[in-house]
């Protein structure tokens, strides 16, 4: 169990680094940048609690998954709402956000015991919609050589698709092998999570390099004047 847990902590560490990088460079950035900053910081808090509880009491941290998926869905829905320029896409994102939240409120009201378990409907709805939003954004900007948040959207698709496939296949408790250490499907999910964080880091570097280039161009123009 130790090796997969170390891999999980590695993902948590990269998440912390990304959160710090975005937080330290958030000044004078746009609303989208601020959303990602808040998303990463609060995600780190949730993941930290999940790892601590999971380490000391395995299997008792399922309730935290609801906060993870719902917060991620709300934060990234706001992100894509502001990222899209098409008014129809904006309305679709807004209506889907309201509809999903209403469905889940009714579901938890009628079945409160779901709070202590994985809610597969919650996971499927929130993950699939975010994957669709990211795919739409990538398709609409496919011909553009450079665009903000392409790395993030690619990472989001890869990570959510991998975790969603685990839930849809019903392999949440499946073990691949036990020697020399226990390895289950969540190990691979952790690897994809690290890849996701790496692409977020590349997004941060791309966004800030772009700003530095713009500042340099402004300085050059002023010198010419």
Predicted regions and their residues:
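Terminal, non-globular segments
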Residues: 1-225
């Amino acid at each position: 169990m130790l090796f997969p847990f170390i891999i999980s902590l590695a993902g948590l560490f990269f998440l912390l680094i990304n959160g710090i990088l975005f937080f330290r460079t958030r000044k004078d950035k746009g609303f989208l940048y601020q959303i990602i900053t808040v998303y990463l910081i609060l995600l780190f808090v949730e993941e930290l609690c999940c790892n601590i509880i999971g380490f000391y009491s395995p299997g008792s941290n399922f309730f935290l998954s609801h906060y993870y998926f719902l917060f991620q869905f709300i934060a990234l829905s706001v992100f894509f709402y502001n990222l899209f320029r098409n008014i129809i896409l904006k309305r679709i994102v807004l209506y889907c956000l309201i509809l999903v939240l209403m469905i889940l409120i009714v579901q938890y009201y009628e079945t409160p015991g779901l709070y202590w378990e994985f809610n597969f409907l919650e996971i499927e709805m929130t993950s699939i919609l975010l994957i669709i939003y990211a795919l739409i954004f990538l398709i609409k900007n496919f011909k553009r050589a450079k665009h903000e948040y392409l790395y993030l959207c690619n990472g989001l698709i890869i990570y959510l698709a991998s975790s969603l496939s685990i839930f849809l296949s019903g392999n949440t408790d499946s073990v691949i092998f036990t020697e020399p250490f226990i390895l289950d499907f969540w190990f691979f999910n952790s690897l994809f999570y690290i890849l996701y964080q790496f692409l977020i880091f590349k997004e941060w570097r791309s966004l800030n390099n772009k700003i530095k280039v713009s500042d340099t161009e402004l300085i050059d123009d002023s010198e010419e004047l």
